[in-house]
Every structure is written in structure tokens, then in C-alpha cells.
């Protein structure tokens, strides 16, 4: 890749709020929804077990999916980059199909003209097609993922660039007006304990620097402080140029090799 890639992860629901359990033996698994308004319940037979197995029920809500769509589209507008949503709606016709339909509705009613004015696009793709395309493209796009897909693909993309170190992590509200910026890799306790023991360490500081620069950039955006935004962009560019110039920590150096 020659340009950055943004993974938009819908950090709500699906496997991360699922109810899973062991099936002890033969029997029938049912899924049932009981409306609060007194209407008839909706019930589906999930499986007839002939012996022990496993089961899981997961969910999501329209309000959260719509909010995620708005956040992704706003992020794309900020960067002037196209936005892609990946699902497996050919298999999960109702579940993933809902993501696809709600994204399209939000785009058509709230963002279509804004994207057209900036000459950028939105498109839904099957997850397997999107993964293959991402491997071939040069970067420069926002990839909207369901919760589990975003968890996995963010690490794939990070390692594709060489390390989690130069990666930024930004949480954005649907309206784009509240931001939390953090280091993507969390803390480096293991490195610090080694340092306390007097051992040599090589810790990449760039994610921590970028956590501040992203926060400052958005502060500048909200305050219409162009100088602060320019400072943030220049500091990030200097960090990238430093790495590309050959000054880097051990993790990246091992991947670059003699190049």
C-alpha cells in the first residue's frame, strides 16, 4: 500500500454481546422474540441436535447501525476518501442485509450530494471480495466493517504496513463532533518491565505521538484553528518521513531487513 487505510469498526453487538452456551445432548434449539406491544411472538427453530454441540444467539439494533453509518460517511468526507461497507449479506440475508440497507438509506438521504460534491463514492461489497480488493488497491479508502470483521481486519492492515506502532485509533460519535484518540496498541507494560530490569528495549513511540496529533487535529477542526491542524499534520508527516528515511525501532527494522 502507498496510502493509509481506515478501518471503521462497528464496536457494538454481534459476537461481542452474544449469548453462547454448550448443548449437553440431543434436543431442539429455538429462537423466540416476544414483542412488548402484545403482538404475536416470532419463533424460529434453529437446529435439531442429535447429540452435544454448541449454540450462539447475537443481535444488533438499527439505531446503532445508523449511527455507525453516519460516523463512517463523516470520516470519509473529512478525508475526501471513498467509503466501502463489507458484509456477507448473501448468506445472512436478514442480519447483514440490514447493515447494507441501512447504510444505503443513510447515504441516499443524508450524504449522497455531499459525496458527489467532493467527487467521492460509497459502495457495498461482499466481505471476501472486499478483502481481495484491499490487497490489490493502493489504499486511500474507508472500510466500514461489522464488529468482528473490524477487529480482525484492523490487525491485518496494521501488520501489512509493518506494525501496530504507526497506527492511529479514533472513536467518533455519529455526528462527528466528539472524538477520542488513543494509541492503537494500548500500553507497553512488558517493555517497561524489561526496562526496569535494566534490559535493552526498542519501543515504537509513534502511536502515542499520533494519539496526541489526531486529538489536536480535531481540536483544531472544532475550533477552526487552521494553525493547530497544520502543526498536527506536519508532526505526523515528520514521523512518517523519519521512518521512511531509515530511522526506526526494532520491530519495523526486522520487517524491512536490508532494504
Predicted regions: what is each one?
Residues 1-53:
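Flexible glycine-/small-residue-enriched beta->alpha junction loops
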Residues 1-4, 28-29, 79-81, 117-119, ...:
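Short coil/turn connectors at secondary-structure junctions
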Residues 6-10, 86, 145-147, 182:
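Short beta-strand segments
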Residues 31-125:
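Glycine-rich phosphate/diphosphate-binding loop of Rossmann-like nucleotide-binding domains
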Residues 79-87, 111-124, 220-232, 242-254:
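Flexible, glycine/charged-enriched surface loops at secondary-structure junctions
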Residues 134-234, 241-242:
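Glycine-rich phosphate/nucleotide-binding loop
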Amino acid at each position: 500500500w502507498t496510502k493509509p487505510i481506515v478501518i471503521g469498526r462497528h464496536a457494538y453487538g454481534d459476537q461481542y454481546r452474544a449469548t453462547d452456551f454448550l448443548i449437553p445432548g440431543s434436543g431442539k434449539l429455538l429462537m423466540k422474540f416476544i414483542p412488548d406491544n402484545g403482538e404475536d411472538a416470532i419463533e424460529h427453530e434453529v437446529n435439531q441436535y442429535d447429540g452435544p454441540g454448541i449454540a450462539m444467539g447475537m443481535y444488533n439494533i438499527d439505531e446503532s447501525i445508523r449511527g455507525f453509518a453516519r460516523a463512517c460517511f463523516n470520516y470519509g468526507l473529512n478525508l475526501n476518501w471513498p467509503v466501502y461497507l463489507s458484509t456477507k449479506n448473501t448468506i445472512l440475508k436478514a442480519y447483514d442485509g440490514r447493515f447494507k440497507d441501512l447504510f444505503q438509506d443513510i447515504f441516499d438521504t443524508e450524504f449522497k450530494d455531499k459525496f458527489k460534491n467532493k467527487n467521492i463514492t460509497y459502495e457495498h461489497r461482499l466481505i471476501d471480495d472486499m478483502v481481495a480488493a484491499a490487497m490489490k488497491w493502493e489504499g486511500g479508502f474507508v472500510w466500514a466493517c461489522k464488529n468482528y470483521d473490524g477487529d480482525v481486519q484492523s490487525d491485518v492492515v496494521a501488520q501489512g504496513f509493518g506494525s501496530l506502532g504507526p497506527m492511529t485509533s479514533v472513536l467518533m460519535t455519529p455526528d462527528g463532533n466528539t472524538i477520542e484518540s488513543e494509541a492503537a496498541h494500548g500500553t507497553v507494560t512488558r517493555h517497561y518491565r524489561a526496562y526496569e530490569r535494566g534490559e535493552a528495549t526498542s519501543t515504537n513511540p509513534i502511536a502515542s505521538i499520533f494519539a496526541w496529533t489526531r486529538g489536536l487535529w480535531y481540536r483544531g477542526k472544532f475550533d477552526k484553528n487552521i494553525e493547530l491542524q497544520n502543526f498536527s499534520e506536519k508532526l505526523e508527516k515528520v514521523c512518517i518521513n523519519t521512518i521512511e528515511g531509515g530511522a526506526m525501532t526494532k520491530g519495523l527494522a526486522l520487517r524491512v531487513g536490508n532494504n
